[in-house]
Amino acid sequence: MAKLHLQWLLLLPTLCSLGAATESASSPDCAQGPKFWCQSLEQAIQCRALGHCLQEVWGHAGANDLCQECEDIVHLLTKMTKEDAFQDTIRKFLEQECDILPLKLLVPRCRQVLDVYLPLVIDYFQGQIKPKAICSHVGLCPLGQTKPEQKPEMLDAIPNPLLNKLVLPALPGAFLARPGPHTQDLSEQQLPIPLPFCWLCRTLIKRVQAVIPKGVLAVAVSQVCHVVPLVVGGICQCLAERYTVLLLDALLGRVVPQLVCGLVLRCSTADAIGPALPALEPLIEKWPLQDTECHFCKSVINQAWNTSEQAMPQAMHQACLRFWLDRQKCEQFVEQHMPQLLALVPRSQDAHTSCQALGVCEAPASPLQCFQTPHL
């Protein structure tokens, strides 16, 4: 029961954001008519004119439709993360994590860390969302002159806006001029023990990553597609379900605990040292092995679709780069199934169907069939 309750808590901001989009139809701007409605996917939803725009305006668009729709979906996901309901849900979960710390003296300090630094971490997360790059990565937009994806250790180059935001007041008395890699000493008026801020920061970020129900969110995002005509709705739903999980993986992969805590608290990039928190068995459970392999399989096939036969093995291994936390497992999956994958990709028109044939994915729950396109 607790597991289901947590999933609905995390799903709530998504549903609220979709509901908010339709409830804002009274906006005076909507009175401008179709010229305003169809400027963007978000405006069409707000003015309850998505069906009109798809049938009368966007239905006559050129070959860049999929690219633009993908970017619009990314923008909607970005907006969801900015909703107060989403941020409140994350905050409440982290406050519960603070409350179960084994050393109760750390609880007020843990909450203080949340108050000061959670907004900065959320801003950093949102700053990693680049619609054009993400949609090119999943194959819905043409590849431009983009720079190669940085490796985790290369991400220390901090953009100027983020550097400006890092000038935040430190916790009173918590830091010295030269903080250590795992703890910051306290002043004499503070607790008479070293406070492991860096370990605490890394632990909380890892917990948030672990409890985000990616599959549930993907289905929730796809629900907006039910307001459009059946054929176009099927395309929209498959776009949302197929790529939302890939998008979340790409975004969460950039919120590496060591990197974020290094930026915010000037922590060392070394692994944190500290006692493990009690397991979250009452709240979450890991994805079943088949779900994990299904996710690996679909990502690998999506990555290899537009490559030559000679380049396929390299493309498949590159697909594992986005799974920073499970990269080794992904590499093992690719090595184990390489012959079957090489045989499936040239004939593949849908990643889920191909992975179902491989035996690592279950039958899709949705009755709508995904569209087929040479660009995917």
UniProtKB/Swiss-Prot annotation:
Ranges of residues in domain Saposin A-type: 25-63
Subcellular location field: Secreted, Extracellular space, Surface film
Disulphide bonds in the chain: 67-141, 70-135, 98-110, 198-267, 201-261, 225-236, 294-361, 297-355, 320-330
TM region positions: none
Domain Saposin B-type: residue ranges: 63-145, 194-271, 290-365
Domain of life: Eukaryota
Signal peptide (UniProt feature, chain positions): 1-24
Assembly and binders: Homodimer; disulfide-linked.
Record function comment: Pulmonary surfactant-associated proteins promote alveolar stability by lowering the surface tension at the air-liquid interface in the peripheral air spaces. SP-B increases the collapse pressure of palmitic acid to nearly 70 millinewtons per meter.
PANTHER family with a match to the protein in the record: PULMONARY SURFACTANT-ASSOCIATED PROTEIN B, SAPOSIN-RELATED
Note: Pulmonary surfactant consists of 90% lipid and 10% protein. There are 4 surfactant-associated proteins: 2 collagenous, carbohydrate-binding glycoproteins (SP-A and SP-D) and 2 small hydrophobic proteins (SP-B and SP-C).
Protein name: Pulmonary surfactant-associated protein B
Organism: Rattus norvegicus
